[in-house]
């Protein structure tokens, strides 16, 4: 159950004055950016902005005059929704739950003992009980995983642990469970190139044997209940992260963090769990239905390796090369008690970054208040971005096998440009929006959303954010 108790150490943002007058010319503020950080942002006389990512070295140029173009998709005219298809628009929809593999967990709305609204995580519901509760979000294995069950079995000697075998046997002990597993395995085999006749001729035991990854796999999907917003009348009214309520978004993150914990705990060879969200097909989504993915891998990954290299040179690099630079260049957008949001720099796509200020760098170990703080700022970033903008949400966390402390940070990247020959030939990425353009767009929209009551309480926006250098406490 998600409860409001704060079980972790407090991470209070200093209420001292932020340098709200800070602008791009950091020469006016000697000593604000740490001397170990080479200049990541340069504005040329013609208005061109050159950026370099302090962790990856990615080079980005923003040329003037292109920052006011609309960002969202150009779509055909909206089509009315068929009421008879409510909850059945795609394989992730709430009335098609038997088209996804057996659930690992779901989060449902409930009432606490004192009558207050709360959330509860239910684990491994049986096939015949899926309709007994209404999941706001549900965690299921990815039918087409990046790393298959056989990858772990053949390369690492992985076998289903006893708990997973027990859950598999219990699920298959009922006719509803067996029928569900047979049907989903058959769907996967047909999609993989088997003919319908071949699949139909397979013995049940062979179909069941192919389901091991449903109970011990390492690529999960966390699926939202809604495909369209409540009351939608046409197919342009998709339900996105930003159309959730702040409470719903918190539940979304809580179930995802719980899934991270579980993947690390159940597969010893896992070195890192990558968490991401692809929104809309131009950003890589298979369905225009809100979901996050978790992929466990047996390496820490190149992104973490680059960050760890910088971290070992400078243990405060996430302050010196990220937050402090954002403060110096007036890129801070918002903050609350345990997190800060700013316009990112040195990214291939325009990016909004949310950093946890907690000393705890792994989401599932953070207190309820710390997790909620990141959730509220990330929800605000999505709401300000809007449901028509393709985006990738990327989580970056400390791998459990790494001793060096790292902050939990989330990047929301707007997929509003297409890589072409210039980028491939030069490795210089051209963006239409500078970090200041991103800041201005998000700030303007946040003020509108706050006036409409759509944001969580406790958020300080713009000059009121009162963010100062060195506030990330991951190295405490």
State what each model feature region is:
Residues 364-368:
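Long, repeat-rich segments with strong aromatic
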Residues 252, 370-374:
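Hydrophobic alpha-helical membrane-association signature
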Residues 2-289, 295-361, 384-396, 400-476:
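Active-site microenvironments that recognize anionic phosphate/pyrophosphate groups
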């Amino acid at each position: 159950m998600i409860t409001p108790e704060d079980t972790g150490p407090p991470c209070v943002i200093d209420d001292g004055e932020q340098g709200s007058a800070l602008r791009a010319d950091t020469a006016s503020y000697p000593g604000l950016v740490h001397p170990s950080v080479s200049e990541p942002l340069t504005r040329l006389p013609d208005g061109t902005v050159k950026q370099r990512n302090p962790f990856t070295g990615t080079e980005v140029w923003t040329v003037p005059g292109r920052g006011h173009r609309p960002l969202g998709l150009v779509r055909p005219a909206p089509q009315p929704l068929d009421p008879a298809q409510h909850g059945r628009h795609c394989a992730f929809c709430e009335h098609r739950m038997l088209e996804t593999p057996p659930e690992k967990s779901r989060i449902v709305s409930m009432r606490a003992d004192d009558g207050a609204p709360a959330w509860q995580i239910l684990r491994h519901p049986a096939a015949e009980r899926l309709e007994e509760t209404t999941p706001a979000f549900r965690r299921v294995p990815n039918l087409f995983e990046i790393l298959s069950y056989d990858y772990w079995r053949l390369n690492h000697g992985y076998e289903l642990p006893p708990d997973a075998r027990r859950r598999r046997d219990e699920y298959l002990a009922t006719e509803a469970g067996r029928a569900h597993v047979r049907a989903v395995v058959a769907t996967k085999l047909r999609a993989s190139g088997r003919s319908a006749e071949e699949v139909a001729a397979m013995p049940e035991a062979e179909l069941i044997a192919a389901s091991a990854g449903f109970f011990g796999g390492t690529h999960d999907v966390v699926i939202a209940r809604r495909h369209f917003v409540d009351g939608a009348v046409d197919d342009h009214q998709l339900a996105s992260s930003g159309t959730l309520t702040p409470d719903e978004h918190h539940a979304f993150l809580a179930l995802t963090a719980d899934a991270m914990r579980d993947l690390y705990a159940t597969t010893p060879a896992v070195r890192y769990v990558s968490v991401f969200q692809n929104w809309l097909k131009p950003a890589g989504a298979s369905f225009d239905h809100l979901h996050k993915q978790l992929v466990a891998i047996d390496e820490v990954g190149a992104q973490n390796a680059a960050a760890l290299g910088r971290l070992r040179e400078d243990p405060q690099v996430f302050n010196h090369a990220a937050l402090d630079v954002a403060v110096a260049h007036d890129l801070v957008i918002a903050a609350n008690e345990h997190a800060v949001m700013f316009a990112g720099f040195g990214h291939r796509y325009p990016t909004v970054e949310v950093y946890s200020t907690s000393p705890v760098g792994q989401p599932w170990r953070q207190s309820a208040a710390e997790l909620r703080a990141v959730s509220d700022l990330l929800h605000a970033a999505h709401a300000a971005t809007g449901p028509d903008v393709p985006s990738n949400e990327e989580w970056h966390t400390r791998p459990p096998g790494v001793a060096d402390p790292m902050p939990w940070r989330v990047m929301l990247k707007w997929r509003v440009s297409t890589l072409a020959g210039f980028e491939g030939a030069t490795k210089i990425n051209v963006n239409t929006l500078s970090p200041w353009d991103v800041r201005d767009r998000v700030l303007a929209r946040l003020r509108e959303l706050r006036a409409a009551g759509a944001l969580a309480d406790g958020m300080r926006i713009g000059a009121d954010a009162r963010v100062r250098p060195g506030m990330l406490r991951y190295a405490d």
